[in-house]
């Protein structure tokens, strides 16, 4: 009996040892495999694109409720075929008039006007631009003013100033051209005389001027486009540019200025409101800043209602299939939906539906008030 028990115990010990030899290494391999698999399946921040599980009402709006004017678009040297296609696409979304801000000056301006307004006189507006080729020659500002007057005679209906003005443009001695540089006073006074608006892009999102660290909410965009960072060693501070811009607007009260992209105050609508209160000749467009409005629907709604006479519809980079996000935000109360460009907003946005009268002003009435030569009969009363 004792012999049998001893044999049984010995057998169990052998089984245990053998099991350890077999199972132990296999368990270790499984842990390694799991770790490797987990590492492989962990997405980067660029790859992580979660789909919302929220179920709410969705409104698919393919065309605007009212015909609208896009005050902020860019088309460089368009061909006849491109313009024909553009009009076909505009018709599908109720885009009645498009403002091309990239008309250039001189012969290029003439060519752009001929290509767009020459073919479709009621569908396009072209803005002129400044050339800085003779910036360092005395009398520059007066010459630009004279060229602008000639451009208006040749079909320009406004002046667009790009973002290099104030940020990157420099004189031969290395001094930065300030936004409120007196050299350009003649240009802005000429705009008042000609009764044309100035659509001006000053600065960039304030986050681009902040430290590029993991607390910067535009970190992902800066990672994708490092050249968008505005480090202090190379660029003036954001607040300096805002001060110069406001000083410029105040110094030319007869000139109507449209600050592009909500003046880069879309993240602080209270500040923007106070700025508009202090500068009655200042207007703003909503081009490329829908994500800012869409993340604060209550504030956005109230802001648009209060400043309904000062805000204009604009898109910036033309893509016909992206306008529907603007329509959905402005015309519905839809909740928590994706923005069309992930790098601009890693957050979802909300509709901030405004009353029809406000919508009409944003879509076309304010532009009709500011831009000469647009046929108002093409729009509702």
Enumerate the predicted regions with their spans.
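Hydrophobic faces of well-ordered beta-strands that scaffold small-molecule active sites
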Residues: 69-73, 97-100, 124-129, 159-161, ...
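H/E-rich (His + Asp/Glu) clusters that bind or coordinate divalent metals
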Residues: 80, 87, 233-381
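Acidic-and-aromatic substrate-binding clefts and catalytic sites of carbohydrate-active enzymes
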Residues: 75-83, 100-110, 133-142, 169, ...
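Bacterial N-terminal signal peptides
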Residues: 9-20
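Signal peptide processing junction and immediate N-terminal pro/mature segment
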Residues: 20-33
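Active-site gating/metal-coordination segments in enzymes
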Residues: 56-59, 109-228
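An N-terminally biased module of ancient metal coordination in phosphate/nucleic-acid-related enzymes
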Residues: 30-122
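Active-site gating loops and adjacent loop-to-helix segments of metal-dependent hydrolytic enzymes
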Residues: 37-40, 44-47, 65, 123, ...
């Amino acid at each position: 009996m004792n012999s049998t028990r001893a044999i049984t115990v010995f057998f169990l010990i052998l089984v245990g040892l053998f099991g350890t030899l077999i199972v132990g290494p296999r368990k270790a391999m499984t842990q390694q495999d799991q770790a490797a698999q987990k590492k492989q399946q962990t997405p980067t921040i660029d790859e992580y694109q979660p789909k919302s599980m929220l179920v709410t009402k969705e409104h698919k709006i393919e065309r605007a409720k009212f015909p609208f004017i896009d005050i902020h678009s860019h088309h460089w040297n368009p061909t006849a075929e491109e313009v024909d296609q553009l009009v076909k696409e505009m018709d599908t979304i109720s885009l009645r008039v498009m403002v091309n801000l990239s008309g250039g000056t001189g012969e290029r301006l003439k060519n752009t006007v001929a290509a767009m307004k020459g073919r479709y006189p009621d569908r396009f507006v072209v803005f002129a631009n400044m050339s800085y080729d003779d910036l360092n020659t005395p009398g520059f500002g007066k010459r630009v003013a004279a060229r602008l007057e000639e451009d208006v005679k040749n079909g320009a209906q406004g002046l667009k100033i790009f973002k290099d003005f104030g940020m990157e443009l420099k004189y031969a001695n290395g001094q930065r051209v300030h936004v409120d540089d007196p050299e350009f006073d003649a240009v802005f006074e000429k705009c008042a005389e000609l009764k044309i608006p100035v659509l001006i892009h000053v600065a960039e999102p304030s986050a681009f001027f902040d430290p590029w660290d993991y607390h910067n909410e535009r970190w992902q965009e800066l990672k994708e486009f490092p050249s968008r960072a505005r480090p202090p060693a190379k660029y003036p501070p954001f607040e300096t540019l805002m001060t110069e811009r406001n000083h410029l607007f105040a110094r030319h009260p007869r000139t109507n200025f449209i600050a592009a992209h909500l003046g880069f105050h879309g993240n602080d609508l209270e500040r923007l409101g106070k700025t508009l209160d202090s500068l009655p000749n200042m207007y703003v467009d909503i081009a490329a800043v829908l994500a800012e409005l869409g993340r604060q629907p209550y504030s956005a709604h109230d802001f648009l209602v209060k400043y309904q006479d000062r805000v204009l519809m604009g898109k910036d980079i033309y893509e016909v299939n992206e306008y529907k996000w603007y329509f959905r935000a402005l015309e519905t109360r839809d909740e928590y939906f994706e923005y069309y460009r992930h790098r601009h907003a890693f957050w979802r946005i909300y509709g901030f539906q405004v009353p029809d009268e406000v919508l009409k002003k944003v879509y076309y009435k304010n532009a009709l008030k500011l831009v000469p030569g647009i046929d108002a009969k093409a729009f509702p009363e």
